Every structure is written in C-alpha cells, then in structure tokens.
Amino acid sequence: MSKSLKHIKQQCRDRELVQEVIELVRRNDHDSLAYVARTLGIPPQLRFVVWPILLKYHPMCISPNIMSNTVVWDPLTSSYHLTNADAAQDVNSSGYVANGAANGSANGYEISKTSTNSSTSDDVVNEDMVHLEKIILKDLRKYFHSRATSSSQAVSSSSSSTAEPSSPTVSDECEIIDSLKNAILRFLSKWSRIFKYEIGLAWLALGLAEWFPALLPAKFDLNDECFLVLNGRRHAHTSSGNNNSTSISQLFQEYPLLDYLKNKLPSERLFTFDQLYERLLLVLIHSPDTALEQNKIKRDFPQDSTHISNYFPVISGGDLSFRTQIFFKVFSTILPELYQPLIEEVNLQPNSSRTSWLYWWFKCAGARSLQRQDRGRIWDLFLGWRPKPDHVTINFYLNYNTKSFAHLYHKSPSICHSKFWNKYEKNDTFWFPDLDSIPLGTPPYTHDVTIIKELLRRNKYEERASDSNDTDQECCMNSIPFSIISPHTQLIFIYVAILQFNEFKLLEFEETEIAEFLNNVPMLSKADDTAFKKLFDTGSTLDNVVLHDEASKRPSSSSNNHMLIEVGSDGKSSHSFNDLMKMAGDIWRKWLWRELEENLNNEP
C-alpha cells in the first residue's frame, strides 16, 4: 500500500471517528464514549463536550478517594504520619520531592482555618488567602512566560496590526488565569485538609484549559468565538518578530469542525470549569485505601507473617509509592541497557531537583512534562476507564467504596451493529490471556495476589478452558469490553514505552540532555495532530505534508529501499500515539508473563 493511500484511509477513519463520537454524544451513550476514549482517543475538536460526559459518570468521581499530601501511610508501623506542614519542601510518600527547589514555589500550602496561635482572627485568614492566591498566580503565569517576553512589544504595535478582531488578547489571558486560579481555590476549599496546594494543581488546571475553554458560558453558539483554549506554547520558540504570539487560540481554528457537525453538538455546558477541574483531579490523583487493603490482606492471609509482600496491586492499582516502584522494576526488566546508564546519569536521590520529572510523570499524570497533544490522549485513557459494571468488580478497584452505582452503566453499546463498532470492538491494548475470564472481586479473587496465583495455576497446569475463546467472541459481539487494569497502572507501561521508543537517543545523550528529555518529552503523536488539524482539508494537502516529511528521512539510494524496516524504536516514523499504546500493551504482557514465569519457577 502506498503511503498516500495509507494516509487517505487514515483521514477517512478519523472523519468517521468524529461523526461516530458526535452520534454517541447525541445519544448520551457514555459507556461507548468511554470505550472510544480509552482505546482510540477522543478527537481534539470534541474533548470539550466529551470529557464532561465521561467525568459525570466516572467511578472515581462518583466514589472518590484521592492521595494525600498532608499525611503519609507507613506500612511498617501500620499507621499514618502527618507531613511537616512548615517545611519549605514536602517529600511525598514515594520518597522524592513533590516540588523541586527549581520551581521557586511554596509547595504544600494549605488554606488556613485558624492561625498557628489558635487565633480566629479574620485578618490572619485573609492574609493567608492573599498569600496563597499570589503563589497560585505565580505558578500559573509560568505557562505564559513566552508571551510575557513580547507582550509589551505586541501592545505597542497593536494599533498597526492587521490581526483579526477575534484574535486572542492579553486581556483574554488574564481572564483565563483568573478562572484557573478560582478553580484551584474552590478545589482547595473542599479538599485542603487532605490535599494542600502544590504547583501540580496549577499545571493540571492549565492542562484542562488546553482542551476545555475556561471561559465557556452556560449557553453558547458553537459558531461564536468563545472557545478559547491554551495552545501549549509555553516555550519561546517563535521569533521575536511574531508580536501577536499568545498562549491561547480558538479551538475550532486550530482543529476545524464542519458547521453541520457543530450543529449536532449540545449548546449548553454540563459543568463549569471549576466543577470539571475538581472531577478531573478526583481521577488523576485518585488512590486506593492502602491501609484498608493491607488490613484485608492481613485478615485473609493470617498464616502469612509477611503479609506486606502480598500487597501487589498491579491490576487494581496501587498508591503513588507502589506505582513508582513498579515503574523502576519494569524499566530495569524491559530496558536493562538503558536503565543502568540513566540511573547513573540522573541522580535519583531523595530531595534532588533532578527527580522532579517523577513528580510530573506520576503524581500529575504528565502535566508540564508531556506535550499537550500526548497528555490529552493519556487523559482520554484515564477518563474513559471503566471496570465491568457490577458491584463486586467496582469494589475490587475502589476498595473503599460503599456506594451502589453499577446501574449507571450498560454492557451493550447503543449502536452495536454499526460498521464502526464492529471494526474496533476488540481494541483493548492492555488485554492479558485469561485475565478477562476471571471474575475480579468475587471470592477468592478479591486481591491481586490471588488473581496472579490463578493465572499461575492456569499456566502451570494448562487449564485454559477450550471454549473460552468462543465465549469471549460471542460476548464481545454483544457487549462492551471493559477495562481490566487500573489506568494508573497503564500509565506506567506507557512511560516505559516512551523510553523504549527513544532508547537509542537516550543512550547517546549527555546528562543535561537526559534531564531535559525527562522534563520535556518531545511530541509523540505528530501524525495524529497533523491529521486532526487538516481533517477536513480538500485535496492532497495532508498527504503532501506527510509524504514530504517521510521522504526527507529516507536513504538517498533507491537500492536501499528494501532496508526500510523497523530496526529500532527510533526507526519508526509514524509518530502515532496508537503505535505507542500498542507498544505499551506489549510491554505489559511481556513483563507480567516474566513475573508469572519467575513465580512458577520458584514454586516447589
């Protein structure tokens, strides 16, 4: 198949995806929307309408439990410990600095209810609030620093500028910053006893504003110029002559959508920005109840004195400390050649500013460190995560849950017989043999360790049911395939895939280059982004752009055409996030299979 034909077909698939998502929105089929989000991703044009729907029905929003930066659970003593609120730097539970000194921000700031000397003076409370607002504004404005360097020049030349009246202005930026600040303050007014302010909250708000307009009114016309989003241009790469450069843009100017498709979308927002921001945080900084889980393990395995070793929630999802431990375990197993030099080059000592990338990667789900387009795709996965809709399965992942809300979900898609659904019905990247046939949460499969033992048993004695494939095939034709592993676990393998994708480059990098890469990962989905920006272009503009880019990478000699095969991660030129997701799924299966084999060999 020629490259031109390949990209024409991809353009057709993307157009079909846009139309299908709009139809699912019209039907309020949030179950199918969630499946599309976690497998294919939501088109950038439609995240502003799809994300609120996904968050409205997200299990982690209906029954929330978030990580805390005010207390730390100590598994050795089985007790909580207060963090030092007066410390200039807080260290989170995984042992690395939550906010490096290079940030220059007062990490761990909490809204005060009373003063330190137990006074109830309103003046003290107001002073604390003013100080907190200043910190938040300072952190938010770091996103716009590229604009600040040329703002005065832009203002002075605005009178002679030929920019369109609808072009974003400095005033728009100020309004957006104020909206983001208010969203953060409202979140803290509800959750500050559990989660104090830290710089990550600012960058998570900025990440949301890249896809959901912070100034979106309650009712709107989709042809109005009210869809202002942040465009991710936080680094000053543009020339000084670009006086009208801003950090915001019109969503539909950047990612076009035909008028007849716009007219099918709702014209009322589902949530305000601050409401949506809170729900997003409930998903991204979600954490299981570690203490409760370890107490259950102690109860269910009383004969095992080393019960902590049975805490291995790689399927249900662990706390932040567990995630980082698993990341380095997987990293060292899958990429040993890269792991050792990277560990030597990048000092991973606690309280080191060089570990700040761990904070952004894991605690903040890619905020600041990933490019806007890649982060949006990862957040699609988080927001689209859905376990099998029954009470015991939901409780397996949300081990603290006391609510009953499985009735909110449906197992069958509303348009299950469409060509689109039949094409993508078996598209779960993170599948694993036999895992989907184990009734998670049902005794005896109430802990990850018992599920892994069952996978071991089936592998050891080759007891896979002969009709399991037929059953799965029949099930998939009539029901939605639901998530098997936690989205936070999936993120671990996506990050390892990113490192594998760039392995050859990283092996050649110097220490400073490695640090820059980890804190500012290059875009991974160039082709996807270009495709959606040119989705409705007529002619062969998209094909010419892609073909020219690929031609520049080919060997000059035609005799070498037979060598155009993938010889390493850097040889891939598609730059599609779906390719990266497939790589992450392969790494997940490869790693877990090794774990099973090691346990199998260690058994008597």
UniProtKB/Swiss-Prot annotation:
Residues 41-386 form the Rab-GAP TBC domain. InterPro entries: Rab-GAP-TBC_dom, Rab-GAP_TBC_sf. SMART domains: TBC (SM00164). Keywords: Cytoplasm. Its main location: cytoplasm. GO terms for cellular component: cytoplasm. It comes from the Eukaryota. Belongs to the OCA5 family. This is Oxidant-induced cell-cycle arrest protein 5.
